[in-house]
C-alpha cells in the first residue's frame, strides 16, 4: 500500500476561507495548468492519482483537528479543505453540527450561479439542521400513518394526509435541485444515489394521484410508499455512513455468495437425485379403495397428532403399523411445499437446512423415508454449508467493517501525528529564535500556556535541532542527529518542507531580518492560542458551576464534622466494607430467587422482612457514602448514581407497597440490585460496558435495523395482510397467532425471521396466498438482508467492542484488582501465614531426622549439603532430564524437557537451600518464587533459572554465601528461556529409569521407594520397577492399550434396550467387560510400579485413567448401592483423550480456555437471573390450563371454564406445561429454550394467553407479553450467547500469541501439512508437455490446449447442469426419455474429451490432478448410465441407483478450477481441515459418551413428541441420531418433553430405567453447553482464523496464483526448463503475463530501469525476472531484501540443481554499451564517408549505389558513390 502524505493542519479559524470570485478564478487557473501538464507529460511516467480523503467525505462530520467553524461562515460557501478538489469546480458548506456538504460551482439548472442569492438561500435551507429535523419528523409521522390500519381506507378524506406528505417531499426536492442542480454537474441532485431514492418515492407517490382509476391495480404501486422510511437515511448523515459500510460489506460478500450458491446448487442437485419423490411416501390403510393415494382420510396419522406417518420400504426406514402399507401419494409434507421433486423445491429445502430453520423436521422426514444412513448427507450439509459458509459471511462482514474503520482512523491519526510533529518543530523554532538573540519574554506565551501533564511531557521529551535552519552553523554541527531523525522519519522531512513553504516562518540563516522574526513570533502565538483553547474545551464544567458545586455540594462545616467524615471515609472505602456489601447483594439475590408459585406464608414473611432489611442496608450505605465523600464527589461516579437509584426505588417499593397496587411494578425493579455485583466482578462489568459501548456506537445501526424491520413489516402487511391474517382459510374456527394482518403482528413475524425462523410462516403465507411466489421472495429477502447482513454487522461490532474493551481494560496485560479481591487477598495472606507457621512447626522434627549424610552429597539430585552445592556430571544430567522450565509470568510451565517428569525431586530438607535445589512445596503452591542460576559442568555457557521458595525480598543467608558454588550464582538468568529450551531439548536424552515412588517426605520413610543404589537390599524391587517402566514406555504397549480402549468402547454400543432378548450377547459382553476391567487394572498397577505414585498422581491424564478404572471395578460388584456406578462406564472412552494426540491438543487448548468460559457462563447466569426473576413475577402460576384429553395445547374457552377451581369441579384436568415460570429453576430452562429458539413459541404462546394466577388462558389476552421475550432475545440471547464466541476466539488468539502464532488445535504432524499448504511461490519451472511430432496428434494437441476448447467444455458443463436442474418428479415419459438421451449425449461428449486428451497428451495426461478427477467422473458416469438400465428391476434397491446417479454431479465440480474466488475460500477450508478434524474427533467423543449415557438412562421413555421408533435412546444409532440433531440445538425441547413427564408415563412396567426429570434436564443442558456453545464455537473460531489468513494472502498484491501463472507462462518461453530465457524474448514474456505482474508493451525502457542481470548468451534467470517484477509491483520497502532471501531459499529447495552462473552484464549496462557502439558506428561512418568522398573527388564514373552496414573497410572499388543510412 502506497504511503499517503497529508498536509499539516492547525486547529485554526484561518483554515476556513470563503468561496469568492477569486477562489473560482484560482480553480479555473489550476484546471488550465493541469490540462497543459497532461498534454506535455511523458506517457511512460505515471504519477499516483490523488484520492479524496476519507475523513473529509460528504455527509461526514468535520474532524475537530481543523478547529471551530467561524459563526459568520456557517452555511456559507467555503473553499474545499480536501486537496483532491483543488482543481474541481466545487465548494463546501458546513452547518452548525460540522457536517460536510459539497456543491458544484457551476451554474445550477444552467441559470443559478454559485453566488446567486436564490441559490445561496436554498443552500442555507438545505444544510440547516432544522430542515433535516423537519423532514425526519415528516417521515416518522408518515410511517405512523402507514403502520395504521386505517390507512388502507379508500375514502377521499383519508387521502388528505397523503397529499400533504407528497407536497412536503416535492418541496424538499425542489429546494435541493435549486441548491445543487439537477443531473449535469458534479454533486448535483441526481448524482447522489440517495436522491434517486427520493426521486422514486416522489414518482410513486405522484403516479396514483394522476393516474387515478385508469390503472386497475395500484396496490403494488402504493406499496412503494414504504420506501419513504428510507428517506431518514438520506437525511441523517450518520446513517449514510453505516449504510455505506453495509453496501461495502455486500461487495466483499460476492465471492462468499457465489460459493454459497454454488454449494447450495450442488447440495440441491444431490438432494434431488437422492430424494426425488421420496417424501410423498405414507402409510395407507389397506381397506381403502383405488383412490387411496389422493384421499387424506386413508392416510395413517401419528398418535395425538394431525401429521401423517411417513415411511419407507427398505432397511433402516420407518415401517407402517399393521393394517397399512407404504406407498407413494400425491401429497408432500407442509402444504406440499417440502419436497425434492424439482430443483427449485430442493434448493429451498437446502437453504432451509443451511440456515438451520426447523431443519430437524426435514432431517427426520428424510431418515424415516430413506433410511438412517443418509444422516451423512446432513452431516456434510450442516458442517460445510451451515457452519462454514454462513460463518464465512460473518468473517467477511467483520473484516469489511474493521477495514473501513482502520482506513478512516489511519487518515485521522496521520494528520494528528503531523500536527504534533509541527508543534514540536515550532517549539524548537522558538528555542532557535532565543538562541539567535530574540527577546525570550516575547515568546513566553507558549511556556505559560496551561498544558496538561501529558502534553508537557510530550513537548519536553525531545530536543531536536531545527529543520528550518539549514544554513546555520548549529544545524551543520548536528548533521548526524538530523540525518538520524530524517532516516527514521522521511515523511517528517517531506512534511517539514511543506510546512516551511506554508507557514509564515522563513529562517534559513542566522541573520534574520525583523520581518522574519515577527512572522516566527506570529506562528508560535497561533499555536499557543490554539493549545489554550483546546485546554479550555476539555475542562469538565463552567467556572460558575464549579463554584456552585463547591459551595453547596461539598460539606466542610466544622472540625467535628470533618473528623466524622474522615472516619466514615476510612470505613466506607475499606475493602472489607465492599466485601460485606457484596455479600449482602448475593444474599439479597438469593432471596429474590427464592420466590415461587404457591409459597407458604412463613416463607413470604421471611422474604418480606429480608427485603426490608436489605433495603435499609443499601439506603444506609448510600447515606454514609454521601456523608463520607460529599454529594459532589459521590455523584460524579456512575456506579454511585446507579446505587442511589436502586436504593431509592427499593425504598419507594417498601413505602408504597400497601398504598397502591398500581405501583407493584416497583417490586420488579428490585432485581436491578443484581447489577451492583458488577462493581466487584470485572467480567460482568466488562459485559455491561460492552453492551453500553455497543448500544452507543450502534445508535445509527440500530436506527437502520429499525427502518429495515419497519419497511418489511409494512410491506408484509400491505402485500399479504388482506389474506394472511388472524383467520385461517382452511379452518375458520382456529385462530392464527403469527400473521401479517396488522402492523404489530407483522413486526413480530419479521422479528421472528431475524431470529432465524422463516420457513413455517412462509408456508402459511403461501397457503393463504394460493402459492404465490411473492411470499418466497419477501421472506427470503428479509432473511438475507436482515439476518445475514444487518445482524452480522451487529455481531461484528459486538465482537469488535469486546476486543476493544479487553484492550482498554487491560492495556499492559495487568488487571486491576477490585476491592473485594483485595479483601479476599487479606484473608488468603492470613491463611497462608497460619499454614506456613504450622508447616514450619511440624517440619522441624522431620528436618532433623532426615538431614543428609556427607557421603550422600554426590548421590542426591543437586546436592543437599549446606557446605557445598557443587553438581557432578551425573547429577547435572539427571537435573537436565527432569527439570521443567518455567516462564517468569505467573509460574506457568512452558514445556517439560522430558515426558517422564514434570517436577524437581529430592529427599532433603523441607527448607532446602535455593542454591542447591528448588522446593517442591513452592512449586505445588503459588508462592513467591525467586530465580537462581544453576551452572552446568558440561556447558559453562548455559545459565538456568531455578525457582526457590524463598521470599524475593529476603537475602541469602551468610552461611550460604560462604559456599563456593553459591559464589557462582547470579541473581537471575540473562539467557532467554525459550532459547535454553530449544537448545537443551536437542541434547537431553529421554529418561530410561523410573522416578521415586512417593514425594520426598514419604520417600524418606519408605526406603524401597528411593532411588536404589547398586548394593542396596532392594535391588530386586528396583529391577522390577525398571522392567515395568520399559514395558509401559514401549510403543507396542501403548498401541495395545489403545486397541483395548476402542474394543471396550465398542462393547458399550451393544448394551442397548434389546440386550435382555439376546442372552448370549449379554453373557459375552459381561465376560469381555471383566476382561477389559482387569486389563485396565493391570495397566494401572504397572504404571504405579513404573512411575511411582508421585509421578502417576501428579498427571491429570493419569487421574482420569484412575477414576475410570475405579468406576469399572465398582461396576463389577453386585451390591445394590453400587449398581448406579455401572452407568459411569460410559466415561471409559475418555481414556482415548490421553492416547490420541489430536484430541489431546484440542482438550489442552479447551482446558486453558475453561476459566474464561466458566466466567462468561456465570455472567450469563447472573444476567439471565434478572430475566428469570422478572419472568417469575410476571408469569408464575399463569401457565396452567384446563384440558379434556392429552393435548395440552387444546384447552377450553375461558368463558366456559374461567379458572382452576371451576375446572376441577367439572371433573376436567388442570394441566401445567412442563416448561413454565413457576420458579427460578423452571424459568432458567424456559429462557434457555427461548435463547436457542427451540420450543420458544409454545412458551410465548402460554405467556401471551395468560390472564392471571390459576386462571384459564384466553387467546392473546396478554398480547404485549411478547415484548418481554423480544427484550430478552436482544439482551439475554444475542449479547450473552455471542459473548461466548468473543471469549473463545479472544482466548485462543491469546494462546496463539504465547505459542508464537502457532495453531493450538494441531499436532506437530498436522502443522507440517498446514505449513506445506501455506508455502508461497515455491513452484519450480516445469518442463511443459512437448508437442507431439505426429501431425494428427499435434493437431489434437493444439485443439485441447487452446483456451477456446476449455471455454466450450465449460459451457457444456453448465448446459449439463441446467438440464439436470430441469428434471422433476412426475414428468411425462416423453420428457424423461429426452433427458435420458441428453444425459447419454453428455456422457459421450465427456468421454470423447477424455479420450482425445489422452490421445494428445499421452502419459502426461495423468500427471495433472484435475485430469485424473475428470477421468474418474467419466468412468463413474459410464457406470451410472449402464446401471440405470436396471433401475426398473427389483434386483437392487432403489437407493443404489440414486447414489450412482450422483456421479453426474461430479462434472459440475469441474467449474471450481475456473473460479479463483471460490478456490481461495476452499483453500481456507483446506487449511482448516487438520484443526477441524481434531475438533470433530472431540465432538464425536462427546457424542459417543452422551449416547451411552442416554441408552442407560432414557431407553424406556414413552414414545411421544420427539421420541419415536427411529429417534430414541433405545439403541446407539438412535442416540447418535438424536445427539447430532441437538448439536445445532435443533429440536432438543421435543426430546426433553417426554422425559419431563412423571414415572407413570414410562414405556415399561419396570421403573428402573425411568430417571428423574432433573437428570434429563442436566443431560440435555450440559450437552448443549458443551457441543453447541463451546465445541461448535471452536469450529467457528478456527474457520474465522484461517479465513483471515487466506484473505490476507489473497489480498496481497501478489498471491500464490500469480506465481503459478508466472511459471506456467515461463514454461512456454523455456520449453527445456533451463530456468533461463533470451533477453530478446523478455518483452513478449512480460506482455503475456496477467496483472499485476504484466509489463505491457512498449516495455524496453522499463526493463532498463529494472537493471536485470544477464549471463552468457544474453540470458536471464527466472528468479531475477520474478524478483524484478515483484519489486515493481510491491515497490521498494525495508522488507524487500528479506523477501528476496526467502524467495531464493524456497527456490533453491524446489530446485536443488539450480545452475549458478555469474552475471556478466545487466540490462542497463547492455543498453549503455549499445548506445556507445551506436555512437562509435556513427562516427566511423562519417569518417569513412569523408575518406571515400576525398578519393572519388574529381573522377567521373558511373554511379553505383551500395548499401552498407557501416563496415566499409573492405570497400576498394573506384568510381563508387556510397549512400550510408
Swiss-Prot record:
User: Repeat IV: residue ranges?
Assistant: 1329-1619
Q: Where are this protein's II repeats?
A: 557-821
One of the protein's GO biological processes = sodium ion transport
Residues assigned to the Extracellular compartment are 149-159, 212-219, 270-342, 368-374, 595-605, 660-664, 723-742, 764-773, 1054-1067, 1118, 1182-1224, 1247-1262, 1367-1377, 1432-1440, 1502-1515, 1539-1559
Q: Kindly indicate whether the keyword Nucleus belongs to this entry.
A: no
Query: What topology does it adopt in the membrane?
Result: Multi-pass membrane protein
Where, in residue numbers, are the I repeats?
115-406
Query: What is the reported tissue distribution?
Result: Expressed in the dorsal root ganglia (C-fiber neurons), spinal cord, trigeminal ganglia, testis, ovary, uterus and small intestine.
Domain of life, per lineage: Eukaryota
Q: Which Gene3D superfamilies does the entry link to? A: 1.10.287.70, EF-hand, iswi atpase, Voltage-gated potassium channels. Chain C
Q: What is its main location?
A: membrane
Keyword Repeat assigned to the entry: answer is yes
The protein's matches in Pfam families, at most eight in alphabetical order, are given as: Ion_trans (PF00520), IQ_SCN5A_C (PF24609), Na_trans_assoc (PF06512)
Q: List the disulfide bonds.
A: 283-320, 765-775
Q: Where in the cell is it found?
A: Cell membrane
Q: Where are the III repeats?
A: 1023-1320
What do the Gene Ontology cellular component annotations say? Answer: axon; axonal growth cone; C-fiber; cell body; neuronal cell body; plasma membrane; voltage-gated sodium channel complex
Describe the intramembrane regions by residue range. 343-367, 743-763, 1225-1246, 1516-1538
| Assembly description | The voltage-resistant sodium channel consists of an ion conducting pore forming alpha-subunit regulated by one or more auxiliary subunits SCN1B, SCN2B and SCN3B.
Q: Which family does it belong to?
A: Belongs to the sodium channel (TC 1.A.1.10) family. Nav1.9/SCN11A subfamily.
Function according to Swiss-Prot or TrEMBL:
Sodium channel mediating the voltage-dependent sodium ion permeability of excitable membranes. Assuming opened or closed conformations in response to the voltage difference across the membrane, the protein forms a sodium-selective channel through which sodium ions may pass in accordance with their electrochemical gradient. Involved in membrane depolarization during action potential in nociceptors which function as key relay stations for the electrical transmission of pain signals from the periphery to the central nervous system. Also involved in rapid BDNF-evoked neuronal depolarization.
User: Domains: what does the record tell us?
Assistant: The sequence contains 4 internal repeats, each with 5 hydrophobic segments (S1, S2, S3, S5, S6) and one positively charged segment (S4). Segments S4 are probably the voltage-sensors and are characterized by a series of positively charged amino acids at every third position.
Q: What is this protein called?
A: Sodium channel protein type 11 subunit alpha
Amino acid at each position: 500500500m502506497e504511503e499517503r502524505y497529508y498536509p499539516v493542519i492547525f486547529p485554526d479559524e484561518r483554515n476556513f476561507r470563503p468561496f469568492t470570485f477569486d477562489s473560482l478564478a484560482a480553480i479555473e487557473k489550476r484546471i488550465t495548468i493541469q490540462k497543459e501538464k497532461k498534454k506535455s507529460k511523458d506517457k511512460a511516467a505515471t504519477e499516483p492519482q490523488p484520492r479524496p480523503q476519507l475523513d473529509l467525505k460528504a455527509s461526514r462530520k468535520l474532524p475537530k483537528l481543523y478547529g471551530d467553524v467561524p459563526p459568520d461562515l456557517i452555511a456559507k460557501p467555503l473553499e474545499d479543505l480536501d486537496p483532491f478538489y483543488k482543481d474541481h469546480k466545487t465548494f463546501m458548506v458546513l452547518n452548525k453540527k460540522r457536517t460536510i456538504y459539497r456543491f458544484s460551482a457551476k451554474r445550477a439548472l444552467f441559470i443559478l450561479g454559485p453566488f446567486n442569492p436564490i441559490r445561496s438561500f436554498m443552500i442555507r435551507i438545505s444544510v440547516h439542521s432544522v430542515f433535516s429535523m423537519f423532514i425526519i419528523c415528516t417521515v416518522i409521522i408518515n410511517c405512523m400513518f402507514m403502520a395504521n390500519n386505517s390507512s388502507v381506507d379508500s375514502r377521499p378524506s383519508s387521502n388528505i394526509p397523503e397529499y400533504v406528505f407528497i407536497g412536503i417531499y416535492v418541496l424538499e426536492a425542489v429546494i435541493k435541485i435549486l441548491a445543487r442542480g439537477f443531473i449535469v454537474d458534479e454533486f448535483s441532485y441526481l448524482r447522489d444515489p440517495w436522491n434517486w431514492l427520493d426521486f422514486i418515492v416522489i414518482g410513486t407517490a405522484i403516479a396514483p394521484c394522476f393516474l387515478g382509476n385508469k390503472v386497475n391495480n395500484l396496490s403494488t404501486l402504493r406499496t412503494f410508499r414504504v420506501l419513504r422510511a428510507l428517506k431518514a437515511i438520506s437525511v441523517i448523515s450518520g446513517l449514510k455512513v453505516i449504510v455505506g459500510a453495509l453496501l461495502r460489506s455486500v461487495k466483499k460478500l460476492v465471492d462468499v455468495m457465489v460459493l454459497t450458491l454454488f454449494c447450495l446448487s450442488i447440495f440441491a442437485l444431490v438432494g434431488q437425485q437422492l430424494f426425488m419423490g421420496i417424501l410423498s411416501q405414507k402409510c395407507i390403510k389397506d381397506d381403502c379403495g383405488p383412490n387411496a393415494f389422493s384421499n387424506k382420510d386413508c392416510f395413517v396419522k401419528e398418535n395425538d397428532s394431525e401429521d401423517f406417518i411417513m415411511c419407507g420400504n427398505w432397511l433402516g426406514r420407518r415401517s407402517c403399523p399393521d393394517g397399512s402399507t407404504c406407498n407413494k401419494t400425491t401429497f408432500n409434507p407442509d402444504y406440499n411445499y417440502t419436497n425434492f421433486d424439482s430443483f427449485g423445491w430442493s434448493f429451498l429445502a437446502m437453504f432451509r437446512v443451511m440456515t438451520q430453520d426447523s431443519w430437524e423436521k426435514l432431517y427426520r422426514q428424510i431418515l424415516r423415508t430413506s433410511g438412517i444412513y443418509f444422516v451423512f448427507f446432513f452431516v456434510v450439509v450442516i458442517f460445510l454449508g451451515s457452519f462454514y459458509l454462513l460463518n464465512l459471511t460473518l468473517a467477511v462482514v467483520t473484516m469489511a467493517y474493521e477495514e473501513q474503520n482502520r482506513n478512516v482512523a489511519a487518515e485521522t491519526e496521520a494528520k494528528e501525528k503531523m500536527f504534533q510533529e509541527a508543534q514540536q518543530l515550532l517549539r524548537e523554532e522558538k528555542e532557535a529564535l532565543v538562541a539567535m538573540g530574540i527577546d525570550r519574554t516575547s515568546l513566553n506565551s507558549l511556556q505559560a500556556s496551561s498544558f496538561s501533564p501529558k502534553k508537557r511531557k510530550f513537548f519536553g521529551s525531545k530536543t531536536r535541532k531545527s529543520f528550518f535552519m539549514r544554513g546555520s552553523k548549529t544545524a551543520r554541527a548536528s548533521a548526524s542527529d538530523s540525518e538520524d531523525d530524517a532516516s527514521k522519519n522521511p515523511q517528517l522531512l517531506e512534511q517539514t518542507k511543506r510546512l516551511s513553504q506554508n507557514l509564515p516562518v522563513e529562517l534559513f540563516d542566522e541573520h534574520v531580518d525583523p520581518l522574519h522574526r515577527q512572522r516566527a513570533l506570529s506562528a508560535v502565538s497561533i499555536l499557543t492560542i490554539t493549545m489554550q483553547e483546546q485546554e479550555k474545551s476539555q475542562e469538565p464544567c463552567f467556572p460558575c458551576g464549579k463554584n456552585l458545586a463547591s459551595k453547596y455540594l461539598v460539606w466542610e462545616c466544622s472540625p467535628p464534622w470533618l473528623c466524622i467524615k474522615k472516619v466514615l471515609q476510612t470505613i466506607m472505602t475499606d475493602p472489607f466494607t465492599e466485601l460485606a456489601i457484596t455479600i449482602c447483594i448475593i444474599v439479597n439475590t438469593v432471596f429474590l430467587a427464592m420466590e415461587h408459585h404457591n409459597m407458604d406464608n412463613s416463607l413470604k414473611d421471611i422474604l418480606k422482612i429480608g427485603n426490608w432489611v436489605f433495603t435499609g442496608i443499601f439506603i444506609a450505605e448510600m447515606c454514609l457514602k454521601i456523608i463520607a465523600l460529599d454529594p459532589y464527589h459521590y455523584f460524579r461516579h456512575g456506579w454511585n448514581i446507579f446505587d442511589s437509584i436502586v436504593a431509592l426505588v427499593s425504598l419507594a417499593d417498601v413505602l408504597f407497597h400497601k398504598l397502591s397496587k398500581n405501583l407493584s411494578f416497583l417490586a420488579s425493579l428490585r432485581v436491578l440490585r443484581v447489577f451492583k455485583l458488577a462493581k466487584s466482578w470485572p467480567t460482568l462489568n466488562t459485559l455491561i460496558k460492552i453492551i453500553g459501548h455497543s448500544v452507543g456506537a450502534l445508535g445509527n445501526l440500530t436506527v437502520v435495523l429499525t427502518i429495515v424491520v419497519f419497511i418489511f413489516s409494512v410491506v408484509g402487511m400491505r402485500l399479504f395482510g388482506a389474506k394472511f391474517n388472524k383467520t385461517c382459510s382452511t379452518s375458520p374456527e382456529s385462530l392464527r397467532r403469527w400473521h401479517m394482518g396488522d402492523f404489530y403482528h407483522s413486526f413480530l413475524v419479521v422479528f421472528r425471521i431475524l431470529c432465524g425462523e422463516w420457513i413455517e410462516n412462509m408456508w402459511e403465507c403461501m397457503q393463504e396466498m394460493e402459492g404465490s411466489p411473492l411470499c418466497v421472495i419477501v421472506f427470503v429477502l428479509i432473511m438475507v438482508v436482515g439476518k445475514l447482513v444487518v445482524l452480522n454487522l451487529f455481531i461484528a461490532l459486538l465482537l469488535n467492542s469486546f476486543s476493544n474493551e479487553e484492550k482498554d481494560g487491560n492495556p499492559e496485560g495487568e488487571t486491576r484488582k477490585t476491592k473485594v479481591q483485595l479483601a479476599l487477598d487479606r484473608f488468603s495472606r492470613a491463611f497462608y501465614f497460619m499454614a506456613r507457621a504450622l508447616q514450619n512447626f511440624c517440619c522441624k522434627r522431620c528436618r532433623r531426622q532426615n538431614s543428609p549424610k556427607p557421603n550422600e552429597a554426590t548421590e542426591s539430585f543437586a546436592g543437599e549439603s549446606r557446605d557445598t552445592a557443587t553438581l557432578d556430571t551425573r547429577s547435572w544430567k539427571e537435573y537436565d532430564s527432569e527439570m521443567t522450565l518455567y516462564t517468569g509470568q505467573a509460574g506457568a510451565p512452558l514445556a517439560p524437557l522430558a515426558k517422564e517428569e514434570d517436577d524437581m525431586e529430592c529427599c532433603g530438607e523441607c527448607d532446602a537451600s535455593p542454591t542447591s535445589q528448588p522446593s517442591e512445596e513452592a512449586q505445588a503452591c503459588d508462592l513467591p518464587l525467586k530465580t537462581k542460576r544453576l551452572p552446568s559442568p558440561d556447558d559453562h555457557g548455559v545459565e538456568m533459572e531455578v525457582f526457590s521458595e524463598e521470599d524475593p525480598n529476603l537475602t541469602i543467608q551468610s552461611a550460604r554465601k560462604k559456599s563456593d558454588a553459591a559464589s557462582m550464582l547470579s541473581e537471575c538468568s540473562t539467557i532467554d528461556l525459550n532459547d535454553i529450551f530449544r537448545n537443551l531439548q536437542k541434547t537431553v536424552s529421554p529418561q530410561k529409569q523410573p522416578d521415586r515412588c512417593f514425594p520426598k517426605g514419604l520417600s524418606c520413610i519408605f526406603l524401597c521407594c528411593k532411588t536404589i543404589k547398586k548394593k542396596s537390599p532392594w535391588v530386586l524391587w528396583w529391577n522390577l520397577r525398571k522392567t515395568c517402566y520399559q514395558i509401559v514406555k514401549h510403543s507396542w504397549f501403548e498401541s495395545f492399550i489403545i486397541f483395548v480402549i476402542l474394543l471396550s468402547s465398542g462393547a458399550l454400543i451393544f448394551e442397548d434396550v434389546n440386550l435382555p432378548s439376546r442372552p448370549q450377547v449379554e453373557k459375552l459382553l459381561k465376560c469381555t467387560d471383566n476382561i477389559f476391567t482387569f486389563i485396565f487394572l493391570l495397566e494401572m498397577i504397572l504404571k504405579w510400579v513404573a512411575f511411582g505414585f508421585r509421578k502417576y498422581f501428579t498427571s491429570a491424564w493419569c487421574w482420569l485413567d484412575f477414576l475410570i478404572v475405579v468406576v469399572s471395578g465398582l461396576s463389577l460388584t453386585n451390591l445394590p448401592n453400587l449398581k448406579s456406578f455401572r452407568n459411569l462406564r460410559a466415561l471409559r472412552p475418555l481414556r482415548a483423550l490421553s492416547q490420541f494426540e489430536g484430541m489431546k491438543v484440542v482438550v489442552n487448548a479447551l482446558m486453558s480456555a475453561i476459566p474464561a468460559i466458566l466466567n462468561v457462563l456465570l455472567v450469563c447466569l447472573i444476567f439471565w437471573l434478572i430475566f428469570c426473576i422478572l419472568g417469575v413475577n410476571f408469569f408464575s402460576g399463569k401457565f396452567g390450563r384446563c384440558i379434556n384429553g392429552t393435548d395440552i395445547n387444546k384447552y377450553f374457552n375461558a368463558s366456559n371454564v374461567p379458572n382452576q377451581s371451576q375446572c376441577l369441579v367439572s371433573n376436567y384436568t388442570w394441566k401445567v406445561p412442563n416448561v413454565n415460570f413457576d420458579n427460578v429453576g423452571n424459568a432458567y430452562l424456559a429462557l434457555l429454550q427461548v435463547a436457542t429458539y427451540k420450543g420458544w413459541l409454545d412458551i410465548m404462546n402460554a405467556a401471551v394467553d395468560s390472564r392471571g394466577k390459576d386462571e384459564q388462558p384466553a387467546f392473546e389476552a396478554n398480547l404485549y407479553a411478547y415484548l418481554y421475550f423480544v427484550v430478552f432475545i436482544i439482551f439475554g440471547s444475542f449479547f450473552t450467547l455471542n459473548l461466548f464466541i468473543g471469549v473463545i476466539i479472544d482466548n485462543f488468539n491469546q494462546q496463539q500469541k504465547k505459542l508464537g502464532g502457532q495453531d493450538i488445535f494441531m499436532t506437530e504432524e498436522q502443522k507440517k501439512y498446514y505449513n506445506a499448504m501455506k508455502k508461497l511461490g515455491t513452484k519450480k519451472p516445469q518442463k511443459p508437455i512437448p508437442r507431439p511430432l505426429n501431425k494428427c496428434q499435434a493437431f489434437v494437441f493444439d485443439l485441447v490446449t487452446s483456451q477456446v476448447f476449455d471455454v466450450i467444455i465449460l459451457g457444456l458443463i453448465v448446459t449439463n447442469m441446467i438440464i439436470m436442474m430441469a428434471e422433476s418428479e412426475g414428468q411425462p415419459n416423453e420428457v424423461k426419455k429426452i433427458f435420458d438421451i441428453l444425459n447419454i449425449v453428455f456422457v459421450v461428449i465427456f468421454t470423447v474429451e477424455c479420450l482425445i486428451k489422452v490421445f494428445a497428451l499421452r502419459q502426461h495426461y495423468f500427471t495433472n490432478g484435475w485430469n485424473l478427477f475428470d477421468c474418474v467422473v467419466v468412468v463413474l458416469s459410464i457406470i451410472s448410465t449402464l446401471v440405470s438400465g436396471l433401475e426398473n428391476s427389483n434386483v437392487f434397491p432403489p437407493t443404489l441407483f440414486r447414489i450412482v446417479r450422483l456421479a453426474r454431479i461430479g462434472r459440475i465440480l469441474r467449474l471450481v478450477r475456473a473460479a479463483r474466488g471460490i478456490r481461495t475460500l476452499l483453500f481456507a477450508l483446506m487449511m482448516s481441515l487438520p484443526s477441524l478434524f481434531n475438533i470433530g474427533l472431540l465432538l464425536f467423543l462427546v457424542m459417543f459418551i452422551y449416547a451411552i449415557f442416554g441408552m442407560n438412562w432414557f431407553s424406556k421413555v414413552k414414545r411421544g413428541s420427539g421420541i419415536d421408533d427411529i429417534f430414541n435412546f433405545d439403541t446407539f444409532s438412535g442416540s447418535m441420531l438424536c445427539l447430532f440433531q441437538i448439536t445445532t440445538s435443533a429440536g432438543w425441547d421435543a426430546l426433553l418433553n417426554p422425559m419431563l413427564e412423571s414415572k407413570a408415563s414410562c414405556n415399561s412396567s419396570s421403573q428402573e430405567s425411568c430417571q428423574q426429570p432433573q437428570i434429563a434436564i442436566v443431560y440435555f443442558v450440559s450437552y448443549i453447553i458443551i457441543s453447541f456453545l463451546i465445541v461448535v464455537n471452536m469450529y467457528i473460531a478456527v474457520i474465522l482464523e484461517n479465513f483471515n489468513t487466506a484473505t490476507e494472502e489473497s489480498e496481497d498484491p501478489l498471491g500464490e496464483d500469480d506465481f503459478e501463472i508466472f511459471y506456467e507462462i515461463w514454461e512456454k518461453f523455456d520449453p527445456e526448463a533451463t530456468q533461463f530465457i533470451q533477453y530478446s524474448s523478455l518483452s513478449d514474456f512480460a506482455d503475456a503475463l496477467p496483472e499485476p505482474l504484466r509489463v505491457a508493451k512498449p516495455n524496453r525502457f522499463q526493463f532498463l530501469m529494472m537493471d536485470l542481470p544477464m549471463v552468457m548468451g544474453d540470458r536471464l534467470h527466472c528468479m531475477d525476472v520474478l524478483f524484478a517484477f515483484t519489486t515493481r509491483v510491491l515497490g521498494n520497502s525495508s522488507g524487500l531484501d528479506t523477501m528476496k532471501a526467502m524467495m531464493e531459499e524456497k527456490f533453491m529447495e524446489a530446485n536443488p540443481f539450480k545452475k549458478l552462473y555469474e552475471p556478466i552484464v545487466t540490462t542497463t549496462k547492455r543498453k549503455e554499451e549499445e548506445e556507445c557502439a551506436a555512437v562509435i558506428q556513427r562516427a566511423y561512418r562519417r569518417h569513412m564517408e569523408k575518406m571515400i568522398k576525398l578519393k572519388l573527388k574529381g573522377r567521373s564514373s558511373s554511379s553505383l549505389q551500395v548499401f552498407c552496414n557501416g563496415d566499409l573497410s573492405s570497400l576498394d572499388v573506384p568510381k563508387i558513390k556510397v549512400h550510408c543510412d
